[in-house]
């Protein structure tokens, strides 16, 4: 049985207090991760962070990865904006990475309060962005932000975000415990529900757990035992 590791050190790890990578730092860490045999390296958010834009520019000529695939991270198109006209989506394509990972809201409360749009528009944002990336030759991953909190509040909507991404062509959909408040039993139940009720193959799912309650490793193991690869 094969498992794939998607490393977020250069993006999520840089959000930790006291951490600020230079472009040279990011290139050096990427080389080490590649030596470790990591499958995917999330390099940062081009277009949103100037250092990340520069990292991807330099990576084209300065990184010779033998094992890992470099990934650009960003967001779905904005509400009410044509995906082909969204500058942030274009920045993801301009990074010229084989894989692009976009974050999507999967908690309907955040869709309505943070994005200030409807559930249907959010699904369209996911659908349009994934389809656009795939049409432009990219492998698309989707991070479902606050998935488990959203699933506890409205399981049907959270699952709909996953299925929308898969149907649009996403290679992998990552369920995120963004607040780090889940327990292994909650993770197991949510994974089983998405697989059994929504009909999403478990090997198309990923897991990303924060460690606020020191359960990230246990929750990740629970997801893997439930079939996530």
Model-derived features: positions:
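Histidine-centered divalent metal-coordination motifs
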Residues: 208-210
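A glycine-rich helix N-cap at a beta->alpha junction
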Residues: 66-73
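Alpha/beta enzyme core
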Residues: 3-5, 12-41, 48, 56-65, ...
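Pocket-flanking alpha-helical
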Residues: 53
